[in-house]
Amino acid sequence: KDAILFLEDVGERPYRLDRNLTALALAEKFRDCAGIILGTFTDCEEPPHDDPSDSGVIADSTLTLQQIIEEVILPYKKPTLLNYRAGHMYPQSTLPMGAEISLDLVQKRILLL
């Protein structure tokens, strides 16, 4: 409780992200946190219809990542930093666990206190 929740993923399909974020919402994790940091979610958009890796999910039948964020996370009206470049990209930004931080939503940065 009262912590900053950081979420990021790589290569996950939008319907799975929707399911996972909805599970967090139902567990009241978004309500209980003080703020949310969302990483870049690299390669997490639906593949084209002709993509051989398509597992049968019709691309037009799923929400986009932006729609999922707007419908599942933003209604909580928590301070939310979107597209924070950390973890799975270069340059890599380290987010220390348990550290006290402040979110600067205007400059899109995290300040260690």
In which residue ranges do the predicted regions lie?
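C-terminal active-site/capping subdomain that shapes the small-molecule cofactor and substrate pocket
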Residues: 16-113
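Conserved mixed alpha/beta catalytic, RNA-binding, or beta-rich assembly cores of soluble enzyme
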Residues: 2-23
